[in-house]
Amino acid sequence: MTLLQRQIPHRVAMGLLLTGQRITAAKALDFGLINEVVPRAQLDAAVARWVGQILACAPLSVQAIKQVVRQTGSLPPREAQALRLPALVAALQSEDSQEGVRAFQEKRKPEWKGR
């Protein structure tokens, strides 16, 4: 329940929680609960595309983003910002950050090392 009320407007969450109403995938998309709706036959391809997009990113950055989002989701903005800064500094000081800049300059895909 707590997660739902953080994801969608209060009145919508209350309506769903109090009535037990089921929602369609299209409604979940409208509410911002999910990122995409695809026909069942295209589900595997859509999952592969999402996974590919995430795996194309620097692993340390993905890890830091997940950690910061989990830690700061319920914090006031000022406290959240204080926790984000160390993760940003660590990511910018990584070997992968340097590789990302080099790859951009050389117009090639980066080769992430997770360091």
Labelled PLM ranges:
Residues 26, 80-81:
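Short, flexible turn/loop "capping" segments at secondary-structure junctions
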Residues 102-115:
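Terminal low-complexity tails and localization/encapsulation signals of metabolic enzymes
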Residues 51, 69, 81-88, 101:
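Hydrophobic alpha-helical core bundles mediating ligand binding, dimerization, or RNAP-core interactions
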Residues 16-17, 68, 72, 86-92:
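Helix-loop "lid/cap" segments that line or gate small-molecule binding pockets
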